[in-house]
A protein has these predicted regions:
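One-carbon transfer enzymes
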Residues: 1-168
Length: 168
């Protein structure tokens, strides 16, 4: 039996990268999506030159296509998903939608600054999040900038979320 994974996300560059990465792991997971704030578009991203594409390809480095919407990625893979115009990740509509999917794991890639309410953690679902920076040392949304200014390596912390912010 495959592990049931739900991507709870806004259509952000981060969520697009997650979805495109999941394409490489379809044998391990049953993948579904719940996308909210669907009328809010992802930020524009710079294009990659042909020389850069060749470099990444030659060195077997994956670089997501940030111009591909998350819905396009899910449609290409015939993955089930639900969309909501509601931008409130803590709404009953979104909580009920996640419950219907019966996920083993919810990967959260929301819009910047959004914090999940306690209601999400009163379920049997585990929530996984990737935070730029070395938690608990680097908190907030500007961790990459401060890592560079302080001449530290840029890091990402993957953690299971809990009711407490940045404490999972």
């Amino acid at each position: 039996m495959k592990y049931k994974l739900v991507l709870l996300a806004g259509d952000t560059p981060r969520a697009r990268a997650y979805a495109q990465t999941l394409q490489k792991h379809t044998e391990d997971y049953s993948i579904k999506g719940f996308f909210y704030g669907v009328n809010k578009s992802a930020a524009l991203t710079p294009s990659i030159s042909d020389a850069e594409k060749d470099f990444y390809s030659t060195n077997n480095l994956f670089i997501p296509d940030f111009n591909e919407s998350i819905l396009t990625t899910f449609n290409k893979n015939n993955w089930e998903y639900f969309t909501a115009e509601n931008k409130d990740v803590n709404s009953s509509e979104i909580l009920e939608g996640i419950a219907r999917f019966g996920a083993d794991l919810v990967v959260f890639a929301g819009f910047g600054g959004q914090i999940l309410s306690h209601s999400h953690f009163e379920t049997s679902h585990n929530y996984l999040h990737m935070h730029p920076g070395d938690l608990p040392l680097e908190r907030g949304s500007t961790t990459i900038y401060y890592s560079i200014l302080n001449r530290r390596k840029c890091t990402v912390t993957a953690f299971f979320m809990s009711k407490e912010i940045d404490a999972g």
